[in-house]
């Protein structure tokens, strides 16, 4: 059993037993297959904590870990909102939100790529500012990135689910706290928890810090009603030991990472489970 499997199952059980239904409301989300309302059971304010002795990835089902890393590179490294760039990587998880111009509007990578921070007399984006400050001002309590821009929320195809990171350097270790306003526990959460831990490992490597703690906070923590049956199956499955994530130690610049610099060894997992997408 991994740390992630244990915490994940605990949250799913809480939602199943105590979750509040939104069926009395007219909800925004619709099922991609038939356009009917996609209702949920939800609880609020959940936290997952990991000591980074193992990589947080589910073993009760197969997680498309390379796809998760490719999405991470698209947002954080390319700082892109162009879905066609993601499609070139063989990833189509954002196709349902692609607008006529081929983008997701002013969301995710668009916000990270805006040059809105002052650094030594020039404007830089949030990622470059973060990397510089972690190296040169480690004791700062302002190591924050923010995707939730109220001025541009109406220009986004989908407002960000994971919207904030805060980084801490303590005794030579890099700690990361992530905040998600909303998390679909069947599809979104397994991707997000894994990929932001990969981000922590990447940035720790290029800034020269050891890995510290990883904290993942969720505001609205929910399960879609059509996902309940398969989640019950998943929770009864055998759990395995955590795999080993290898990141190419030769990479010293954040922008030099490619998908080939990541390998996952000994990933034992249950069979893939299909969960319908709500949009």
From Swiss-Prot:
UniProt KW keywords: Cytoplasm, Methyltransferase, Nucleotide biosynthesis, Transferase
Signal peptide as annotated in the record: none
Disulfide bonds: none
Top-rank taxon, per record: Bacteria
Protein name as it appears in the record: Thymidylate synthase 1
GO biological process: dTMP biosynthetic process; dTTP biosynthetic process; methylation
Matches recorded under SUPFAM superfamilies: Thymidylate synthase/dCMP hydroxymethylase
Keyword Hydrolase appears in the UniProt entry: no
Pathway entry: Pyrimidine metabolism; dTTP biosynthesis
Gene name as annotated: thyA1
GO cellular component: cytosol
Catalytic activity reported: dUMP + (6R)-5,10-methylene-5,6,7,8-tetrahydrofolate = 7,8-dihydrofolate + dTMP
Binding site for dUMP: 141-142, 181-184, 192, 222-224
Role played: Catalyzes the reductive methylation of 2'-deoxyuridine-5'-monophosphate (dUMP) to 2'-deoxythymidine-5'-monophosphate (dTMP) while utilizing 5,10-methylenetetrahydrofolate (mTHF) as the methyl donor and reductant in the reaction, yielding dihydrofolate (DHF) as a by-product. This enzymatic reaction provides an intracellular de novo source of dTMP, an essential precursor for DNA biosynthesis.
Binding site for (6R)-5,10-methylene-5,6,7,8-tetrahydrofolate: 184, 278
């Amino acid at each position: 059993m991994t740390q992630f499997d244990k915490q994940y199952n605990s949250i799913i059980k809480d939602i199943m037993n105590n979750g509040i239904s939104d069926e009395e409301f007219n909800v925004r989300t619709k099922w991609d297959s038939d356009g009917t309302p996609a209702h949920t059971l939800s609880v609020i304010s959940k936290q997952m904590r990991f000591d980074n002795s193992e990589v947080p990835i589910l073993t009760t089902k197969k997680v498309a870990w390379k796809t998760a890393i490719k999405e991470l590179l698209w947002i954080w490294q390319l700082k892109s909102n162009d879905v066609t760039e993601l499609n070139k990587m063989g990833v189509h998880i954002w196709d349902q939100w692609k607008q006529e111009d081929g983008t997701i509007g002013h969301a995710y990578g668009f916000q990270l790529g805006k040059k809105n921070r002052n650094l030594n007399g020039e404007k830089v984006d949030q990622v470059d500012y973060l990397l510089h400050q972690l190296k040169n001002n480690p004791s700062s309590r302002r190591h924050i990135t923010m995707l939730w821009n109220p001025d541009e929320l109406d220009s986004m195809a989908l407002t960000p689910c994971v919207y904030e990171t805060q980084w801490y350097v303590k005794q030579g270790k890099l700690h990361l706290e992530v905040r998600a306003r909303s998390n679909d526990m069947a599809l979104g959460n397994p991707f997000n928890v894994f990929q932001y831990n990969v981000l922590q490992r990447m940035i720790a490597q290029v800034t020269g810090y050891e890995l510290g703690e990883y904290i993942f906070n969720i505001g609205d923590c929910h399960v879609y009603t059509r996902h309940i049956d398969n989640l019950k199956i998943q929770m009864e499955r055998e759990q395995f030991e955590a795999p080993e994530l290898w990141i190419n130690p030769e990479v010293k610049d954040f922008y030099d990472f490619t998908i080939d610099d990541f390998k996952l060894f000994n990933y034992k997992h249950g069979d893939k489970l299909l969960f319908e997408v709500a949009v």
